[in-house]
Amino acid sequence: MIKKCSNKSIVIAGAGLTGLMSAIKLRQLYPDKEIIVFDRAHHVGGMYSSLSYSQSVMFDYGMHIIYESCNKEIDDLYTKVMPKSEWHMYENNEKDIAGLFFNGRLQTYSHYIDLRTFSQKDRNIFTGSLMHMLDKPDSKSPNNVMDFLRNQFGCEIADVVHRPILHRMYGIDPEDLDVFAIKATALERVVLFDSAIMLDLMKSSKLRERLAFPDQLNLPPIRTNNQKALYPRKFGMVHFVDRLRSYLESIDVDVLTETDIQHIRQQRGRIKQITLNSKKSGIKNIAVDRLLWTVGWPLLSKQLNLDISDLKFQKGPEIIFVNLSFNRPLLMERLYYFYCYDDGFATFRVTNYSNYCPGAAQDGWFPLCVELWPSKIGKKRTVMEINECIELAVDELKRFGVIGVDHKLIFAKVENDVSEFPMPSLENKKSLKVIRSRVEDLEIKNLTVAGIMASDDLFFIPDILNDAFSKLHSL
């Protein structure tokens, strides 16, 4: 039996953080409207949810801290949903303590590439390369990531240092990568000078855009905002996500999980009705006042019956989450996480949960997540056995120096079918632009698109939420 909603509803496709936070704002803007959020997953929050292996064993999907949007109407919602007393709040130099494994060394002082690890001869060449670029005008529209990096640092640094890293990470010619590739792991700066010299050099905006301070915990107060980082005091981002869902239900927002969209009916430039198929409640036809779409342009084009068979999409690196617990703290100093750029490693990132959530370490368990990109070592996740993933992660942790002979593995689980990292290629960006244009050509008056890549370079949640809330205000 098909159920039908008589009143027009505001419908939100996607129950990730964008969809859920937008639902709160829409309720504030439209107190009398029916609001429905749906998602095909069995849980809300997307990658901001958590994996629960038992009542006492939980892991996040790698590194997920909430960074404020520096927009009061957004940031106030976090403490509206969950009081300040239930959050860890980090600011200034403790907001994001990140590192990097590069040139065989774990950098606990900066996640930017440290060129001081090269020979003095190379460092002299790199310094000359960078200084030479300062006299040239900045490129306003670089063609690809290598154009940007050469303009930023000069050919000697871009081609010798960055090119092999980017090729190793994404498996395609870096000339075919969009500029956005530098933002995913912060490749826009390098460490080249010690702290004393940098204190003087930072007075120049051109140098500040290119050079990183080599001691993140003692970085001078030069930030232009007071952005904070938030994480629940109780380990597991799901604790916030669950509270968010409960809050939405308390303000009469319907949240439907395990629900697919079957059909969108358009008429005279408007979406009139959508058909949802819910595992719990069956098929439902919903009269639509407005549709907020947060789950990507390709899925939207499919639902709107647009032909995109002429477009190509390159798949990004496959991700394997290896969740481990050891019997003692990891040898990472204060790092929340670090990346790995070196050859011969499958690791993309290691996250040490107890460094930003002390409650994660309980009963002698110290949890961490190793995110493997098997393509970095020429493998596919489909052919990697569970034990192979665990052994690989543990071996690389030893090579990083993060665990020693006294560390005993007491828990291990592998998630090898969760996600892929978005490929920041020129081809993908071009295809998304074409889809966006084709959707916009339909001139659907009551459709709003938000979320990752809703517009160029939208990837991080603070930017995504600012973009979404701006669009909601203009409905």
What are these regions (language model features)?
Residues T127-Q262:
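Active-site/ligand-binding neighborhood in enzyme catalytic cores
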Residues I2, K8-V37:
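N-terminal Rossmann-like FAD-binding beta1-loop-alpha1 element of flavoenzymes
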Residues R27-Y53:
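Glycine-rich FAD pyrophosphate-binding loop
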Residues Q55-P137, L187, V191:
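Dinucleotide-binding Rossmann-like beta1-alpha1 core, especially the glycine-rich loop
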Residues L29, R233, T259-V383, N387, ...:
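Mid-domain catalytic core of redox enzymes
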Residues M89, N93-E94, T257-T259, R265:
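Short loop/edge segments at beta-strand edges and connector loops
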Residues T18, H43, P298:
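Conserved Rossmann-like nucleotide-cofactor binding loop
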Residues I2-K3, S50-S52, Y109-H111, T117, ...:
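Conserved flavin/dinucleotide-binding core of flavoenzymes
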